[in-house]
């Protein structure tokens, strides 16, 4: 029965026996002394041997934190609880005490050892030992144990009373009696200290108070023995508590630490401590750096340091230690830093606040600092339940400002004095932050600030709890201050009662006295305060098993006391209530109920108070082992110990609640079976439940809400109810009867908490208990999950989990249909995260308890719940998925698009168009669907796909991430973070092996799709290696229009077909995909996928349908990812999809497209990226352009773009707006372009030079890839020609329809001028416009850029025209003539030259742009203007335009045509890189642009010609022809690369060598100022690159004509 400690202490017990031979029961001596010897081991043994040792031990005991107390207290506390009534208990509970002692000792040993270790017991022991030595030896031994360090006088009085009591009780030698008294008092104090050790830190004060109250408790026991002793003890206890409060570990002097915190170079404290990694020697940073400049070795050792790369590191931890150890060092260092930087304001501006001496962390404290703190009562819940007006004042926190060296003991003293708390009877714990962190008395505020990292951001928040220290059995809930008078009276009454009880206990040491004692105690209780009742309980429990009814009364009285102990009135009430034993139970029951509720919330430890007989009977059998094992498992959780050692351990537990549990709440409803007593056998009966109850109690001790579902046996149900302390205690200690009573109590106490809270708390408890708990609780847990799961499910789902899953199933599909839909649906899945849980509780038959509980249950019950859980999420989703599959199933693209659109397609496949529009721009989406379907079969497939895909592209770009997030959130019920994919869904649904029926293969698919979804942003690289950035831009905002890409106006037109690149990019994404027919194919893997993939996607449908994949969102994402990512991720993504068999994503034509798609995507992205840079410029320019002219060109451009798109490569023509520009460049500078894929990154000059080349390269790629698909069709196809012609919206009707929304914007843009410019960039024509501006003429030829160019030309007119518009208009007729001539030329084989002159005219148009460039900033035109150095040209142009005549314009045009013929030929040669289709298309494109240029740009051309003349005159360029001539050679020489550098500033399209004479001249000028222009033009250059291609394309276009 004796624990190893008690056995080890037996020798001491023997000595004690020897001294205590006279003790009536030697067994008592053994058991008590053994257990008490643990506490008294040193105390009692030393009592006989060393009085000083006794005082030390008593200090250890009283401190409850002492290391000696660790061993001694562990047993003594354990024993103490058993032997709480000193001699009475000893006689009565001799055998029971031994048994309980072993159990309690084991449990308490573990608890106390851990707690004591936690409390830094050894330190306390030293200080307390010193204090203890002050007390007189023998007498001090007894009183010291009770009263930590009581004065000798008090000790003498206490010793006398103890001796008298001892003599009365059993004529034992005074030494023995003092040993017993000290052992009992120490046991009481140790029990209080054991409970205090449960809260090690509080116990010190507690133990002090416990010791003072140890004096009181021992005194109660003693006071029962002698009232005088109680008085003396109380007086001594007060002093003791002060002594103990002041007692602290011997301080370590700074001199002992100095060698470790000083720098050996400067012999000062370390500043900016820096450690050499090899030898770990630390020095000041400045000292070490100076040393290393001279030496190569560590200053303290010979470790060689590499001067080149010294391996030294800043040691912030060591520096913090130095600052914390050395008072004032940190403040002085801050002052030095401030003084240093005060004289160096320049350096201070560059220094960080820390370097300047600003205390940003506020983590270093000084002893002189003032710390603000709040002190509030920890058990407000209890007070509120039965609070009285007097207590209201205690509810509000007290705010104090104390010096940093203020100790916790001072705060305790403040509370004692503030509320007039009797230090003898009550102990106070001070907690910080959390009510489980009990602080040691010697802690200073600075210590606490360092230990718990107070950051001065708010007052330190301290809690205090008051509890009755003398009661070893019951650890009172925080007891309020009781008037000293009441306390004294109660003590006297208790003393009298004890005397009576002692006599009875002497007569009947075993259980016989129970009845008598019960009667006496009951009478006394009626007459006396609750404290007496508690004492009686102790007596009854310790002396003899009192009637269970009495126990109930006592326990409830105890509970009442706890509740009411907060206020003296409460205590008196409890005493009155407790006075009638049976009646008390009824009044106290409500109290108990309240207590139980509080305990549930606060994890109240339940101390089972049972008769010694029960202890003997129950504990020895099962409770001891269980309690030991449970205590071991639970590390001294008082609850487990209380449940295990029903009576004695219950007593101990009350005082030894685990530090984690709130001791005040610990209510020992030990075996309070029912108000009426229950047979002593009940403990045995409960022992089965007992094992569980300790667990539940233990869990309670950890603040677990222990409401368990009543599933299996009533006992287990009660155990689960252990949630309510009364029920668990009853369950533990009581037989079924007690269960019934407890049920009543617990239900009455907290019917909701018992029933519903049970499920909640129980689920949590289950989650925790199953781990610790025996299989029984696990048994309970599977049934419990039914209730628990409901609670566990998110609160939102808790009720509608069943319905939630069906709802989710249907709603899930709609969410995929639209991203917005997805969000709410995601909310539903998340809110209805229940769907998986609902399956869980449906299948498991478990109710959802608490959301928190639910996850643990899912984890626990994964084997049980998984089928329901995983299928449910999918079951909810699968219908949606099936719908998606069915809706989109007809077309793989649809599925993909639907998935991309976040199931917008899935839910509404026909809606795909709508969702697309919604995702992007309503108008573009519709046109996209029309063109894609009307233009190609792919268009239909892409119509579904593009519809799904284009919007999804846009969505995949903009909404793509959203969809991924939505989808992931859908599956996860918001559990998955935005970046997380559906795989995270697994927490709800365990992963099943493929063989298991619950295994959802398609589930994996969603995971893959999700990841596919993730890569989709990367498709940039997939679209084009160089275009990854653009693709991301497209994904994110609009690859083209400055990432707004266009709101979609222009991108949507193309983006419908270009949906892939980043339809979100708007025009740019359109450009990207149009960049190659591949654009659709590339960006819209749908193009290739459309045919074969549909079949594959049909398969996918089958997969989804067959698998019932519950990942509609992710599934949609997956497919969309294939389609959306196809361009870039085709290769990588497709493999991913392929790798899982589930990946219907295998719907792949992805690999087929990658080549074209990659290049097309690159081209598109490159185009897009340049336009992205340009959009702002275009925006600025757009306002000026004449709306009418601008509108037609965009329309024509759109038409053109659409016709190419309508052909297979309908996309490439659309790209031509962005992309056609690129192809021209591509053909001439295709080589250079290949070299310059980085154009966006290139420096302005490089960008000007190289950007064209990258675009050319992209154009070449696009040309090579898309010529067959779109170029052949676009140029050759009548529609393309028509489209190129301004009216060519016929083929482009879908595109024209697409662009019409855009065109209106364009119209509005010129009209709105400043307003629309912004729109223009959004439109995505803006990026194109920028290229158009760069190419002034070619852009208009470009379909997208043509609109931009037209706008720009018009805008330029407006911008310049605002100043020189009349002149421009005047010049416009000649320009028109020239253009007409150019048109004629273009009709002829020579038209390319005229077109080039037209380009040249365009160039003037750009030049004017450049003049406006400051406004439009970095438009390609502005770039040309800047390059021309004609930022001032706006003035010149105004005058020059007026001066220049149509003849000059005509001459310039002729020269340009003549010069450009060769250039055109050369360009055509380069165009060979581009497919003839690209040539044809570009030619047609250029025709249209030229016509537009003629229309809109005649004035601009005239202006430009005049400008050229002016530039020639002013710049020495000479006539335009002269300028053109120089340019021609330049063009010829660097056809791909050299010309672009010269031309790129102005006409990156022409740089390919297509530069027209006119274009060349401006370029020459541009070159002169290209340095300046390039900087601005870099963005414009990007635009120019886009524009350059059209310029380059112009010759081919002209040729085709």
UniProtKB/Swiss-Prot annotation:
Residues 8-91, 182-198, 228-245, 567-590, 638-649, 729-739, 1011-1022, 1069-1085 have a biased composition (Low complexity). Residues 1036-1045 have a biased composition (Gly residues). It is found in: Nucleus. Residues 199-215, 676-689, 929-938, 1116-1133, 1261-1272, 1352-1375, 1561-1587 have a biased composition (Polar residues). This is Polycomb group protein Psc. PANTHER family: POLYCOMB GROUP RING FINGER PROTEIN 1 (PTHR10825:SF29), RING FINGER DOMAIN-CONTAINING, POLYCOMB GROUP COMPONENT (PTHR10825). The lineage of its organism: Eukaryota, Metazoa, Ecdysozoa, Arthropoda, Hexapoda. Its main location: nucleus. Keywords: Developmental protein, DNA-binding, Metal-binding, Nucleus, Phosphoprotein, Zinc, Zinc-finger. CDD domains: RAWUL_PCGF2_like (cd17082). A zinc finger (RING-type) spans 263-302. Component of PRC1 complex, which contains many PcG proteins like Pc, ph, Scm, Psc, Sce and also chromatin-remodeling proteins such as histone deacetylases. This complex is distinct from the Esc/E(z) complex, at least composed of esc, E(z), Su(z)12, HDAC1/Rpd3 and Caf1-55. The 2 complexes however cooperate and interact together during the first 3 hours of development to establish PcG silencing. GO terms for biological process: anterior/posterior axis specification; chromatin remodeling; heterochromatin formation; negative regulation of gene expression; negative regulation of transcription by RNA polymerase II; regulation of transcription by RNA polymerase II; syncytial blastoderm mitotic cell cycle; ventral cord development. It comes from the Eukaryota. The modification Phosphoserine is found at residues 656, 658, 1139, 1253, 1266, 1274. It comes from Drosophila melanogaster (Fruit fly). GO terms for molecular function: chromatin binding; DNA binding; promoter-specific chromatin binding; sequence-specific DNA binding; zinc ion binding. GO terms for cellular component: nucleus; PcG protein complex; PRC1 complex. Residues 1-91, 165-245, 561-693, 711-856, 895-960, 1011-1097, 1116-1315, 1330-1408, 1512-1601 are annotated as: Disordered. Residues 611-637, 1247-1258 have a biased composition (Basic and acidic residues). The modification Phosphothreonine is found at residues 1222, 1236, 1251. Polycomb group (PcG) protein. PcG proteins act by forming multiprotein complexes, which are required to maintain the transcriptionally repressive state of homeotic genes throughout development. PcG proteins are not required to initiate repression, but to maintain it during later stages of development. Component of the PcG multiprotein PRC1 complex, a complex that acts via chromatin remodeling and modification of histones; it mediates monoubiquitination of histone H2A 'Lys-118', rendering chromatin heritably changed in its expressibility. Residues 812-822, 1204-1217 have a biased composition (Pro residues).
């Amino acid at each position: 029965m004796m624990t190893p400690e008690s056995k080890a202490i037996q020798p001491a017990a023997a000595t004690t026996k020897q001294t205590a031979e006279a003790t009536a029961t030697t067994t008592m001596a053994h058991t008590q002394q053994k257990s008490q010897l643990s506490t008294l081991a040193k105390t009692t043994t030393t009592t006989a041997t060393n009085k000083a040792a006794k005082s030390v031990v008593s200090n250890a005991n009283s401190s409850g934190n002492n290391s000696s107390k660790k061993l001694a207290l562990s047993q003594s506390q354990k024993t103490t609880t058993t032997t709480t009534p000193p001699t009475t208990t000893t006689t009565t509970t001799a055998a029971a005490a031994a048994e309980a002692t072993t159990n309690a000792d084991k449990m308490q040993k573990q608890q106390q050892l851990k707690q004591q270790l936690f409390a830094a017991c050894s330190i306390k022991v030293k200080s307390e030992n010193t204090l203890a030595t002050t007390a007189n030896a023998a007498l001090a031994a007894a009183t010291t144990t009770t009263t930590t360090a009581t004065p000798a006088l008090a000790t003498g009085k206490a010793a006398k009373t103890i001796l008298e009591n001892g003599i009365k009780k059993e004529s034992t030698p005074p030494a023995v009696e003092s040993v017993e008294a000290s052992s009992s008092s120490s046991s009481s104090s140790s029990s209080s200290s054991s409970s205090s050790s449960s809260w090690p830190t509080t116990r010190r004060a507690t133990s002090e108070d416990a010791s003072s109250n140890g004096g009181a408790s021992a005194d109660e026991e003693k006071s029962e023995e002698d009232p005088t002793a109680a008085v003396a003890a109380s007086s001594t206890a007060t002093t003791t508590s002060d002594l103990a409060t002041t007692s602290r570990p011997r301080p370590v002097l700074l001199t002992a630490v100095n060698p470790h915190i000083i720098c050996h170079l400067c012999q000062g404290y370390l500043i900016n401590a820096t450690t050499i990694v090899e030898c770990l020697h630390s020095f000041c940073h400045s000292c070490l750096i100076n040393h290393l400049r001279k030496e190569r070795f560590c200053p303290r050792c010979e470790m060689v340091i590499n001067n080149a790369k010294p391996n030294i590191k800043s040691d912030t931890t060591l520096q913090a230690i130095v600052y914390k150890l050395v008072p004032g060092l940190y403040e002085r260092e801050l002052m030095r830093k401030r003084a240093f930087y005060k004289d160096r304001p320049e350096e201070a501006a560059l220094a960080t606040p820390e370097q300047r001496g600003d205390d940003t962390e506020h983590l270093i404290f000084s002893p002189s600092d003032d710390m603000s703190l709040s002190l509030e009562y920890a058990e407000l819940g209890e007070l509120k339940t039965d609070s009285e007006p007097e207590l209201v004042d205690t509810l509000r926190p007290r705010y104090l400002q104390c010096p940093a060296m203020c100790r916790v003991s001072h705060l305790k003293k403040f509370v004692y004095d503030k509320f007039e708390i009797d230090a003898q009877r009550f102990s106070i714990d001070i907690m910080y932050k959390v009510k489980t962190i009990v602080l040691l008395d010697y802690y200073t505020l600075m210590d606490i600030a360092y230990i718990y990292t107070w950051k001065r951001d708010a007052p330190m928040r301290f809690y205090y709890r008051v509890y009755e220290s003398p009661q070893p059995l019951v650890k009172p809930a925080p007891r309020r201050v009781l008037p000293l008078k009441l306390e004294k009276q109660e003590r006297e009454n208790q003393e009298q009662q004890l005397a009576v009880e002692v006599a009875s206990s002497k007569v009947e040491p075993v259980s016989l006295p129970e009845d008598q004692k019960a009667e006496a105690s009951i009478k006394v209780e009626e007459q006396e305060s609750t404290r007496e009742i508690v004492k009686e309980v102790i007596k009854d429990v310790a002396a003899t098993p009192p009637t269970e009814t009495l126990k109930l009364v006592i326990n409830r009285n105890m509970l009442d006391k706890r509740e009411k102990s907060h206020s003296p009135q409460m205590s008196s009430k409890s005493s009155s209530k407790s006075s009638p034993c049976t009646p008390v139970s009824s009044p106290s029951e409500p109290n108990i109920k309240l207590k139980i509720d509080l305990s549930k919330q606060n994890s109240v430890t339940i101390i089972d108070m049972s008769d010694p007989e029960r202890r003997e009977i129950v504990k020895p059998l099962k409770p001891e082992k269980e309690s030991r094992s449970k205590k071991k498992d639970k590390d001294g959780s008082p609850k487990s110990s209380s449940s295990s050692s029903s009576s004695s351990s219950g007593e101990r537990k009350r005082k030894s609640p685990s530090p984690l549990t709130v001791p005040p709440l610990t209510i020992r409803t030990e075996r309070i079976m029912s108000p009426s007593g229950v047979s002593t056998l009940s403990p045995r009966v409960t022992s089965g439940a007992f094992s569980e109850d300790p667990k539940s109690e233990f869990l309670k001790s950890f603040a677990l809400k222990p409401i368990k579902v009543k599933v299996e046996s009533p006992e287990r149900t009660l155990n689960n109810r252990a949630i309510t302390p009364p029920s668990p205690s009853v369950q533990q200690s009581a037989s079924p009867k007690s269960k019934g009573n407890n049920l009543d109590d617990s239900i009455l106490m907290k019917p909701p908490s018992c029933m519903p809270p049970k499920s909640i708390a129980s689920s949590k408890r289950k989650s925790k208990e199953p781990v610790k708990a025996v299989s029984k609780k696990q048994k309970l847990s599977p049934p419990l999950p039914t209730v628990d799961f409901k609670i566990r499910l998110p609160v939102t789902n808790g009720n509608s989990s069943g319905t939630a899953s069906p709802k989710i199933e249907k709603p899930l599909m709609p969410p995929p249909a639209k991203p917005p839909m997805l969000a709410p649906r995601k909310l539903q899945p998340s809110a209805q995260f229940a769907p998986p849980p609902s399956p869980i509780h449906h299948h498991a038959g478990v109710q959802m308890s608490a959301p928190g509980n639910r996850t643990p249950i899912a984890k626990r019950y994964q084997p049980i719940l998984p089928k329901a859980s995983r299928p449910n999420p999918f079951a909810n989703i699968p219908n949606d998925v099936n719908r998606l599959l069915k809706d989109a199933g007809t077309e793989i693209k649809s599925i993909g698009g639907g998935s991309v659109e976040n199931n917008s397609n899935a839910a509404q496949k026909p809606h795909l168009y709508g969702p697309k529009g919604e995702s992007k721009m309503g108008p573009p989406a519709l046109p996209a669907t029309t063109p894609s379907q009307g233009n190609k079969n792919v268009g239909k497939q892409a119509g579904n796909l593009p519809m799904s895909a284009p919007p999804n592209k846009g969505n995949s770009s903009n909404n793509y991430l959203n969809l991924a997030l939505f989808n992931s959130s859908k599956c996860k019920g918001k559990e998955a973070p935005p970046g997380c994919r559906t795989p995270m869904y697994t927490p709800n649904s365990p992963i099943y092996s493929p063989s298991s029926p619950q295994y959802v293969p398609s589930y994996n698919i969603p995971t893959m799709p999700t990841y596919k979804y993730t890569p989709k942003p990367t498709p940039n690289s997939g679209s084009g290696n160089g275009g990854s950035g653009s693709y991301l831009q497209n994904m994110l905002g609009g690859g083209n229009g400055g990432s707004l890409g266009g709101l979609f106006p222009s991108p949507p037109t193309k983006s419908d077909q270009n949906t892939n690149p980043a339809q979100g990019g708007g025009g740019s994404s359109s450009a990207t995909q149009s960049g190659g027919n591949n654009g659709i194919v590339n960006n819209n893997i749908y193009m290739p996928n459309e045919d074969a993939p549909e079949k594959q996607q049909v398969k996918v449908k089958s997969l989804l349908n067959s698998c019932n994949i519950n990942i509609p969102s992710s599934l949609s994402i997956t497919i969309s990812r294939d389609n959306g990512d196809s361009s870039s991720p085709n290769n990588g993504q497709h493999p991913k999809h392929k790798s899982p068999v589930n990946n219907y994503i295998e719907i792949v034509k992805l690999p087929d497209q990658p080549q074209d798609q990659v290049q097309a995507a690159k081209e598109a992205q490159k185009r897009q990226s340049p336009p992205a840079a340009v959009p702002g410029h275009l925006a600025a320019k757009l306002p000026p352009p004449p709306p009418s002219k601008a509108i037609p060109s965009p329309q024509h451009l759109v038409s053109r773009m659409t016709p190419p798109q309508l052909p297979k490569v309908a996309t490439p023509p659309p790209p031509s707006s962005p992309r056609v520009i690129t192809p021209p460049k591509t053909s001439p500078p295709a080589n250079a372009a290949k070299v310059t894929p980085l154009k966006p990154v290139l420096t302005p000059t490089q960008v000007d030079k190289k950007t064209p080349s990258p675009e050319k390269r992209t154009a070449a790629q696009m040309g090579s890839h898309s010529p067959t698909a779109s170029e052949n069709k676009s140029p050759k196809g009548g529609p393309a020609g028509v489209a190129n012609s301004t009216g060519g919206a016929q083929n482009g009707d879908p595109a024209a329809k697409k662009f019409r929304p855009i065109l209106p914007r364009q119209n509005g843009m010129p009209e709105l001028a400043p307003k629309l410019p912004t729109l223009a960039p959004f439109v995505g024509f803006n990026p194109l416009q920028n290229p158009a501006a760069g190419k002034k003429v070619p852009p208009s030829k470009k379909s997208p850029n043509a609109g931009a160019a037209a706008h720009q030309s018009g805008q330029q007119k407006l911008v310049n025209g605002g100043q020189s518009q009349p002149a421009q208009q005047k010049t416009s007729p000649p320009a028109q003539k020239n253009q007409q001539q150019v048109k004629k030329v273009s009709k002829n084989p020579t038209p390319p030259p005229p077109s080039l002159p037209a380009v040249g005219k365009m160039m003037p148009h750009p030049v004017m742009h450049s003049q406006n460039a400051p406004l439009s900033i970095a438009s390609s035109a502005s770039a040309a203007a800047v390059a021309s150095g004609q930022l001032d040209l706006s003035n010149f142009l105004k005058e020059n335009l007026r001066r220049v005549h149509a003849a000059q314009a005509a001459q310039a045009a002729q020269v340009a045509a003549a010069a450009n013929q060769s250039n055109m030929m050369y360009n055509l040669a380069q165009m060979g890189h581009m497919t003839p289709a690209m040539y044809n298309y570009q030619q047609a494109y250029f025709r249209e642009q030229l016509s537009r240029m003629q229309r809109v740009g005649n004035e601009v051309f005239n202006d430009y010609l005049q400008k050229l003349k002016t530039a020639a005159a002013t710049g020495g360029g000479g006539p335009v022809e002269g300028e053109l001539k120089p340019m021609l050679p330049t063009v010829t020489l660097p056809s791909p690369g050299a010309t672009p550098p010269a031309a790129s500033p102005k006409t990156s399209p022409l740089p390919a060598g297509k530069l027209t004479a006119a274009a060349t001249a401006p370029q020459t000028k541009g070159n002169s100022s290209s340095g300046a222009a390039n900087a601005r033009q870099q963005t414009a250059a990007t635009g120019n690159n886009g524009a350059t291609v059209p310029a380059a394309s112009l010759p081919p276009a002209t040729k085709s004509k």
